[in-house]
Amino acid sequence: MEHFQTISPEQAYQHWQNKSAIMVDIRDPQSFRTGHACGAFHLTNDTLNELMLQANFEQPVMVMCYHGHSSQSAAQYLLNIGFETVYSINGGFEAWRRDYPHAVDSLHNPA
């Protein structure tokens, strides 16, 4: 895959349920602490090496941001550094939280 693909929150949820993809969240630390998809890896410049050491580059990666815009650049970057299949989630965390509130780990709703 040379370019990332965009997927709907529904498609991302199916991957999440099946544990068939890694979920990464690129939002700022405060936003991530306040709430994120259950099991999401908080991807920052400081945690990129950790992801690369832990990840299977053949396993799909789903990238989540606030609304689905910033995740596109991050998705392309992950492809460029060797991940084989990368998705950007349309609507980002806002769509995920709206559609799947039970799949959110937050200060008010711990997983």
Swiss-Prot record:
Its EC number is 2.8.1.1. GO terms for biological process: glycerol metabolic process. Pfam families: Rhodanese (PF00581). SMART domains: RHOD (SM00450). Its main location: cytoplasm. It catalyses: thiosulfate + hydrogen cyanide = thiocyanate + sulfite + 2 H(+); thiosulfate + [thioredoxin]-dithiol = [thioredoxin]-disulfide + hydrogen sulfide + sulfite + 2 H(+). GO terms for cellular component: cytoplasm. Gene3D superfamilies: Rhodanese-like domain. Keywords: Cytoplasm, Transferase. Residues 17-105 form the Rhodanese domain. One of its GO terms (molecular function) is thiosulfate-cyanide sulfurtransferase activity. The keyword Cytoplasm applies. It is found in: Cytoplasm. The active site is at C65 (cysteine persulfide intermediate). Transferase that catalyzes the transfer of sulfur from thiosulfate to thiophilic acceptors such as cyanide or dithiols. May function in a CysM-independent thiosulfate assimilation pathway by catalyzing the conversion of thiosulfate to sulfite, which can then be used for L-cysteine biosynthesis. HAMAP family: Thiosulf_sulfurtr. Belongs to the GlpE family. NCBIfam families: PRK00162.1. This is Thiosulfate sulfurtransferase GlpE. The gene is glpE.
